[in-house]
Amino acid sequence: MERVVERVAVTGAEAVANAMRQIEPDVVAAYPITPQTPIVEYFARFVADGVVRTEMIPVESEHSAMSAVVGAAAAGARAMTATSANGLALMHEIVYIAASYRLPIVMPVVNRALSGPINIHCDHSDAMAERDSGWIQLFAETNQEAYDFTILAVRLAEHEDVRLPVMVNLDGFILSHGVEPVEFYPDELVKKFVGELKPMYPLLDTEHPVTWGPLDLYDYYFEHKRQQIEAMENVKKVFPEIAKEFEETFGRKYWFVEPYRMEDAEHVMVALGSTNSTIKYVVDELREEGYKVGSLKIWMFRPFPKEQLQELLNGRKSVVVLDRAVSFGAEAPLYEAVKSALYEVAARPMLGSYVYGLGGRDIKPEHIRKAFEDAINGNLIADEQRYLGLRE
């Protein structure tokens, strides 16, 4: 099949909605919440116009949305939803249940600060609150990645050695409402790539009746959690295989992380999401000035790519970690994960922790440069949490 792409200028929300259109899930249940709302608005239009045959369920809350897709997935349907911030927090109970039931649900999460005070703009507090829920978590830098990851996530979630739900994270407003060029793949090619869902133990298979969600006490609960752990570990084996097939089909290469100008870099910055575009801009500037700097974008936050970080960051002079979320009373989430991964390497770099952009505060090139300059000048202090763009 010929790979002919359509290059269009769209928002991240429209890009994700079009990926959902091409996937054509059996069921989508959703409740509107800023800045996720345009995703389900676009998709609801596809349903109303008869473009897709998806059963669209408008529910009264995000708790109900996740409950509905859990029920649909357990019945054997390919099910999706989308949310942001307080909506994800309201889902919290059922988010854990979806993972523990091993249901291959795909959920775009348009990242927004959690209340309070109430805030509708971007940070990663919503996703970080669910990082231990058992969901695979992918983070997009661009609208193209948000589109691609939505498609790729279906295959990853439904793989027989994984069977775990996936969150596709895209930064609120920055990506969801920002317009960028995106290459849409042919509908037939996407449908061929995602294939047909092969349900496991569906409730509607009356020839093989099963019970979902029974009481699971100390006689089996522990073993079931161990199975979840093993499934998450399997992602590290399965993801490269699916990513390779994605590259062969669509021409784009994905991995757990994306190194940028890392070949001889002495000082490296690590971050999630759209901020990586600004980091790359500053890396290019500093390279022109003769500084050996680079960046490492984390595409997959859960499971955390520990081995890849150890390989790429061992022996560097310094590593600066940027977090768009905090963990009150502890180290920032991404910094904590990077620090833990590098504890085992032979030549540990100096580490620096920087929190930025809470509540949608802009992160500017001069902020990135300041953090790099601290690293270059040897001014990093391990475990000292610093802040970029904060009035103090």
Curated annotation (Swiss-Prot):
It catalyses: 2 oxidized [2Fe-2S]-[ferredoxin] + pyruvate + CoA = 2 reduced [2Fe-2S]-[ferredoxin] + acetyl-CoA + CO2 + H(+). GO terms for molecular function: pyruvate synthase activity. InterPro entries: PFOR_II (IPR033412), Pyruvate:ferred/Flavod_OxRd (IPR050722), Pyruvate_synthase_PorA (IPR053390), Pyrv_Fd/Flavodoxin_OxRdtase_N (IPR002880), THDP-binding (IPR029061), Transketo_C/PFOR_II (IPR009014). One of its GO terms (biological process) is response to oxidative stress. The keyword Oxidoreductase applies. It holds the Pfam family PFOR_II. Heterotetramer of one alpha, one beta, one delta and one gamma chain. This is Pyruvate synthase subunit PorA. It comes from Thermotoga maritima (strain ATCC 43589 / DSM 3109 / JCM 10099 / NBRC 100826 / MSB8).
